[in-house]
Amino acid sequence: MTTSVLVPSSLAREAEDRREATRKLGYVARAAAVYRVDRLTVYPDPDGAGKWEDGFVETVLRYAATPPHLRKEMWGKRDELEYVGVLPPLRVRSQTGSGSEGSGSLRQGIVTEVGADGRVRVNCGMQHPISLPVPADMDVEQGERVTVRVSSRRPVRAKLVDAPTTGFDVVAADLDAALSRDDAGLTIASSRYGEPVTSTRLGQLAERRDAEGGMTVAFGAPERGLPSILDVAPDAVGGDQTSDEPEGFDLWLNTVPNQGSEVVRTEEALFASLTCLTLTE
């Protein structure tokens, strides 16, 4: 089952400075990690662009999703990453559930060199890059991210494995393209104008999500909710969309009914929505 989250490129538009913008994006990445999101998609919102350069949101989120031991190798120094020190740690669990220091744990690495002898050098957070044989059924290239199973650190015993990397992927795509993916599942728009979520409705949502093989949940930006971004009248959205609506969602939901604040920030909406929508029966 695939869980995808869509956020706009204008996500940090109201932040006063780059530090605050980076901190805000860190909370978004943290929500994606906590709720085991598989894919975090940044969709364009040119009309809501703020003071930050094009690509800033995607770059910071990609950096946050990169395992700490690979960040220097993959990113170096970039202006957009000036304040990444304020990002919260994600502490993404490995696919095995083992800690990164445990025997038999899975670690992500980056291929730094491909040899002619069927071996590669991989930086996977050990003291030095390690040389590993490439399994016959694998084809890897320099710069590629790979999964390494470490069975011992002293002496080093490790091997490349054909396993999915942990954490979530960050991609950029148009909203229409993201909603029309084969693995999009149940498509949900999070909006204060949507149908209020109730305890009775949650069971129905979980059943429908599982039947669809996952879900895609979209969010708006500060002072620019999804109706504004999509140029849709707020009173035109509701719960189930029974016809071919231009917005392309199966459901419009309000996961913070009776909100006590005039504005629910996007990062707050992520936690509120994913808490409800990832519940199981």
From Swiss-Prot:
Q: Which InterPro entries match?
A: Alpha/beta_knot_MTases, NA-bd_OB-fold, Put_MeTrfase-C9orf114-like, tRNA_m1G_MTases_N
SUPFAM superfamilies, per this entry?
A: alpha/beta knot
**Pfam families for this protein:** Methyltrn_RNA_3
> Membrane-spanning residues where?
none
> What name goes with this protein?
Uncharacterized protein rrnAC1612
What is the species listed in this Swiss-Prot or TrEMBL entry? Haloarcula marismortui (strain ATCC 43049 / DSM 3752 / JCM 8966 / VKM B-1809)
